[in-house]
Amino acid sequence: MSSRLSGLLDRAAGKRVLCIGDVMLDRFIYGVVDRISPEAPVPVLRHSREASMPGGAANVARNLASLGLEPVLIGACGDDDAGRELLSIFDQDLSLSVRLVTAKGRPTTLKCRFVAGGHQLLRVDTENVAPVSEATEEELIGILSREAPGSAAILISDYAKGLLTDRLLKAVTKLAADLNIPLIADPKGRDFARYGAVDILKPNAFELSAAVHRSISTDEEAALALREALDTLPAKAIIVTRAARGISYIGQDGNVHHEAGRAREVFDVSGAGDTSLAALATAIAGGGTLSDAVHLAIAASGIAVGKAGTATVSAEEIKAALSVAGPVGRAGLLPMDAMIGQVERWRAAGLKIGFTNGCFDILHPGHIRVIEQARAHCDRLVVGLNSDNSVKRLKGPLRPINNEQARADVLSALSAVDGVIIFDTDTPLDAIAALNPDVLVKGGDYTRESIVGADIVEARGGEIVIVPLVAGHSTTAIIARSETGK
């Protein structure tokens, strides 16, 4: 299966896919909470940094680009600060073709999340969910008609923010049918019939439950709900995402299948549905079956939920995750060339890149402290891991205790780690020079002058962070205690 899915990713590369839907700006305000307000029983967030990125249908398009396809994003934004910020982000991202209509008098949908310690404290939404004007509909239909020919798939990403009117949905459905283009819809609300004869309808469990007025907690209940929905809808197939329970789906043959998710510690579910939608389209664009599409979506979303913010997933990450069986996977371990490309995509999205390194032979609280502190100073954290040969040269012939693959697997499973690379040199200097992180973090009694790569990072305006050691915790001490029993 893994080689088949990897082949689909390769065949889908460069294919043109249209994505139409509600475009929004996702803003994350990060800080620290260490006291309660004297004015009211609410936490006080001490602001540290902010990050903004395209969300909704725009995040679907970003995921398509990250997976190697050529997306065309079609939607609308307002003539306001949030809309201008979105357009500015798009101007810097050459992987997307953006066709946005400016809806006069209508705000750009903005979701502002306040985050501390990896947890969302509050979300503030700015939006107008009324249907867009007839003039906006006309512009969008015209764009669709011009852009659709030659596309490998069309995606509908509905967040119920007013863009996907009944008229626009009918136009999309007719266009896809006339041009024989696969049509995939991520619906919102209870009325699934309004999406017409789509090839794949992808609700989540809550949406499907509301549409059929039936609980779907178990596989049996999910099967009943899927059969009932398919019997009453013109859709050819329905896929329901069920969070930790994985995905259940039904095709035209009426058979229901259940696929377990790829277990991984969940850090943030923001945008995971967008990632799975993009993966479905990628599989279809690559000539895959419904089953292929489901398995690729599971692999992609399993990686996405292990990342903070509205995250994208690359083809290289999926291939790495597919290459190893088991619950941990290797979604974070990439060859250096692939990691350089991933870092470039993160940076193009306006994300702050952090780097730390070490042998991480036997993971202990001191390691965890450094990694968590490193992640607190950036949006995406890459960990450089000394290879087995490098550890032997530095620590002696009896080290490492755990080989590089085992150490990489453990690091990749941590929610604070977004990527892992293995370097064979004695220092990470070459890796730092190649990745150009914005933040370089080191644990221990270091000075700025003694940290390898500090000059490279500071030369491009980056930050150096030194995390104090946790007393009594080191791999050497753990090994000594195991030998003496003390």
UniProtKB/Swiss-Prot annotation:
Reaction(s) catalysed (UniProt annotation): D-glycero-beta-D-manno-heptose 7-phosphate + ATP = D-glycero-beta-D-manno-heptose 1,7-bisphosphate + ADP + H(+); D-glycero-beta-D-manno-heptose 1-phosphate + ATP + H(+) = ADP-D-glycero-beta-D-manno-heptose + diphosphate
EC number assigned by the record: 2.7.1.167, 2.7.7.70
Coiled coil: none
Keyword Protein biosynthesis carried by entry: no
Keywords: ATP-binding, Carbohydrate metabolism, Kinase, Multifunctional enzyme, Nucleotide-binding, Nucleotidyltransferase, Transferase
Pathway: Nucleotide-sugar biosynthesis; ADP-L-glycero-beta-D-manno-heptose biosynthesis; ADP-L-glycero-beta-D-manno-heptose from D-glycero-beta-D-manno-heptose 7-phosphate: step 1/4; Nucleotide-sugar biosynthesis; ADP-L-glycero-beta-D-manno-heptose biosynthesis; ADP-L-glycero-beta-D-manno-heptose from D-glycero-beta-D-manno-heptose 7-phosphate: step 3/4
Keyword Nucleotide-binding: yes
Region named Cytidylyltransferase: 355-486
BP-aspect Gene Ontology terms: ADP-L-glycero-beta-D-manno-heptose biosynthetic process
InterPro entries for the chain: Bifunc_HldE, Carboh/pur_kinase_PfkB_CS, Cyt_trans-like, PfkB_dom, RfaE_dom_I, RfaE_dom_II, Ribokinase-like, Rossmann-like_a/b/a_fold
GO molecular function list: ATP binding; heptose 7-phosphate kinase activity; heptose-1-phosphate adenylyltransferase activity; phosphotransferase activity, alcohol group as acceptor
Region (Ribokinase): 1-329
GO cellular component, one term: cytosol
Enzyme active site: D274
PROSITE patterns, per the entry: PFKB_KINASES_1, PFKB_KINASES_2
Residues binding ATP: N204, A205, F206, E207
Disulfide bond positions: none
Family from the record: In the N-terminal section; belongs to the carbohydrate kinase PfkB family. In the C-terminal section; belongs to the cytidylyltransferase family.
Record-linked PANTHER family: BIFUNCTIONAL PROTEIN HLDE
HAMAP family xref list: HldE (MF_01603)
Assembly description: Homodimer.
Function: Catalyzes the ADP transfer from ATP to D-glycero-beta-D-manno-heptose 1-phosphate, yielding ADP-D-glycero-beta-D-manno-heptose.
Protein name, UniProt field: Bifunctional protein HldE
Organism: Hyphomonas neptunium (strain ATCC 15444)
Underlying gene: hldE
